[in-house]
């Protein structure tokens, strides 16, 4: 059967240049995603000194500034995940990138510079739109990479795409440091009051340009990748199994990859009468879908929700616990807080985050997804408990260079990325049928981003009370750490009870579909029935 031959050829294909090209093209979207999502912490430090120098930013406004992009990301995952299955992965892949490019520039050119409230509303709007594009990139990149990859190294390829986030975090920190240093050195260091956005402030006027420049630079990687995305063909699995056009699928793969048997598949398929696309034997969220895939969807969504509660809260700790704003404000040290937060983020990314990603790339197809995910949740729980119980001892003097705490903080990110933060991105791209794959990945990812909102907003409100020296209340931070440890334990339990291993199996094997001969089967379902 031509479909079976095509999928078998893809699963057995040797590693070749196009696989690495696909990793770069798909990964640059996630690179941009990470840049845009994680540059906001140091930027909010700058905005607080430029527009709110007499008062600190309220918890409600700070929570909204973090949550608005995450909300857009969740909606983008749902919308583009659905569109990826409805009209094709390739057709909407470039659209998500364009949204990121234009909204990044929109953030920089926030349309009102006369009042700080207007600036924040404009920035919030464009951050929300930016989130839509970022969210769209998650299910499309994961699905495309999973459908291009061979069976033996599929996990490593998807993990490599996701690992570009680490480089995006590192780049956002580097850009922030360079911009802050350049603007600081260009300033005169005076303490004279100036006018920024209609407000009297010690911050120099050019500081209002600095944070906008950081945001706009995030558009460049996405813009440079757009052309190459448009050259990518539709995935063979979507064309063959959803559109029922195995001839076109074989031709597309022959154009970009050297796969044995592709030429023969094209010849054999051309001699057969093409069947028109038929409706799926069951619909999304139907009783049959839930009986076959409900457990997998629950496990993928719950685990992503839990890990994002922890991961995004951990990132927020960077700008809240490590307080660098105790110097008197003048026209140059308006950049100091942002620089210090970005520098620490760069150190954590280089020493913990990026190595964690690449440990997963190396071990994912050797150890398996479930074992890595359980190990990551367990060790993160241990680190949170070790850091949380004696928290007041670590920070009794609030030493920003406390080496013991910094090591523990870095281990959180290492075991997050050599663990559930990466595997929750991989598993939903491998479990579901081709016609539901992008949608289910989007649902799982959206659950994760709602977890990120819960963690981010919850932590900000839980630690809103500060001590006399301006640091968050020690008791509240300790409780937050212990709660995060409990969340990790819950993730380990959910993984153990509900998550299925996908290593070493084809995507069609992982679908685990049971097709009845009495039901009206599509060619894709008939393929699965004959194969198994």
UniProtKB/Swiss-Prot annotation:
One of its GO terms (molecular function) is ATPase-coupled phosphate ion transmembrane transporter activity. InterPro entries: MFS_dom, MFS_sugar_transport-like, MFS_trans_sf, Sugar_transporter_CS. The keyword Membrane applies. It is a multi-pass membrane protein. Residues 44-62, 113-124, 176-207, 314-343, 393-406, 463-478 are extracellular. Keywords: Membrane, Phosphate transport, Symport, Transmembrane, Transmembrane helix, Transport. It is found in: Membrane. Residues 1-22, 84-91, 146-154, 229-292, 365-371, 428-441, 500-532 are cytoplasmic. Induction: Slightly induced in roots during phosphate starvation. Although related to the sugar transporter family, it does not transport sugars. This is Probable inorganic phosphate transporter 1-9. It comes from Arabidopsis thaliana (Mouse-ear cress). The gene is PHT1-9.
